[in-house]
């Protein structure tokens, strides 16, 4: 359905005129609105992922919580966005859910494609630090992102040095009342996410924990450097079991993973991925140590 021209009424009774379609993904379509600072994200209510996003926005991504966390951690920017409003729209046959969220600029995937499918090492390390800061914030609220990839990392419209990790349709609550979720497989959760970057735990049906997000970021950084992961071509065939098995094969062979993907083994990525692979499912990572590794790669 094309929503352009429709007037949507949100939960606060404000009205939004839907403009042209500017993006479409696995978790909804994105349109401009009559306010240039915001876009509207729409999907059928029955799909459920936008409800997951809405809940995450309203429970976790409160401006006061974000600002307090930044102050307490002495971090100037956290790449999460907030939700301006939400609501439901009913057509003749289908009910839709919509969110009104911040309008951003181009995504990192477009930037990489415009640069011959690779970024300089310094840029990759700096992006890695920004995403590490962002997932640390999410993790300390008890949630994992579950779908880190270049197309879900978006530049600020005005300040190109600010990045945002968006699309919260696969966030998972791994911590509740101070207790980590148990290490129990759920067949309905197997292979969630983007197959090429899905963490091994998710392949097996476990809730993505902190180590899963860090694992995915490691795979992404290899790709951003221009590497081709050993399972990239397999992922295109949608053979989930073979992708999972191939990832598992490299868990204790990080040097081989990097040499196969990049034809060289950047010291910082070797350290980063080795440290990720040493984490247990329940373990809280030493984010400062990970940050230090990436800083070394960016500045030395």
Curated annotation (Swiss-Prot):
Keywords: ATP-binding, Early protein, Host cytoplasm, Host-virus interaction, Kinase, Magnesium, Nucleotide-binding, Phosphoprotein, Serine/threonine-protein kinase, Transferase, Viral release from host cell, Virion. InterPro entries: CK1_Ser-Thr_kinase, Kinase-like_dom_sf, Prot_kinase_dom. This is B1 kinase. It is an enzyme of class 2 (transferase). Its main location: virion. Residues 16-282 form the Protein kinase domain. Its cofactor is Mg(2+). One of its GO terms (cellular component) is virion component. It comes from Variola virus (isolate Human/India/Ind3/1967). ATP binds at residues 22-30, 45. The lineage of its organism: Viruses, Varidnaviria, Bamfordvirae, Nucleocytoviricota, Pokkesviricetes. Interacts with host JIP1; this interaction increases the amount of MAPK bound to JIP1 and subsequently increases the activity of transcription factors, such as JUN, that respond to these complexes. Interacts with protein OPG198; this interaction inhibits the repressive activity of OPG198 pseudokinase on viral replication factory formation. Belongs to the protein kinase superfamily. Ser/Thr protein kinase family. Poxviruses subfamily. Essential serine/threonine-protein kinase that plays different role in the viral life cycle. Phosphorylates the host small ribosomal protein RACK1 thereby customizing the ribosomes to a state optimal for viral mRNAs (which contain poly-A leaders) but not for host mRNAs. Facilitates viral DNA replication by inhibiting host BANF1, a cellular host defense responsive to foreign DNA. Phosphorylates host BANF1 on serine and threonine residues; this leads to BANF1 relocalization to the cytoplasm, loss of dimerization and impaired DNA binding activity. Its EC number is 2.7.11.1. The active site is at residue 147. GO terms for molecular function: ATP binding; protein serine kinase activity; protein serine/threonine kinase activity. Induction: Expressed in the early phase of the viral replicative cycle. Autophosphorylated.
